[in-house]
């Protein structure tokens, strides 16, 4: 299992609009092969920054998604919200203890 974690800073005061757009765009991708779930989290100390995380069955499924038309459409929609740098990490999940 792998997790994709992206940190980014948004335009000042744009979080609510970004979150609405994120929810709308990613609701289209719920059936992406290998996708186990997503989280969007806002920094408690800096309301204009946060993380988007997605959990994947394997790296191949994640890479296929990152090359897809859906991913390109989503990124084109979300990119205007970002200012400055954003960074993405791909990590292998070593331990899980999720409670529903």
Give the label of every model feature segment:
Residues 1-50, 57-67, 81-100:
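Short S/T/G/P-rich N-terminal loop/turn motif that feeds into the first structured element of a domain
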Residues 72-74:
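A common structural junction motif
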């Amino acid at each position: 299992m792998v997790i994709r974690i992206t940190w980014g800073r948004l335009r000042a005061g744009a979080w609510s609009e970004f979150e609405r757009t994120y929810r709308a765009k990613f609701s289209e991708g719920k059936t992406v092969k290998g996708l186990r779930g997503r989280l969007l989290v806002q920094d408690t100390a800096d309301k204009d920054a946060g993380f988007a995380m997605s959990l994947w069955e394997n790296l191949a499924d994640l890479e296929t998604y990152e090359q897809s038309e859906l991913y390109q459409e989503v990124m084109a929609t979300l990119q205007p919200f970002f200012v400055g740098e954003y960074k993405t990490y791909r990590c292998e999940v070593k331990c899980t203890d999720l409670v529903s």
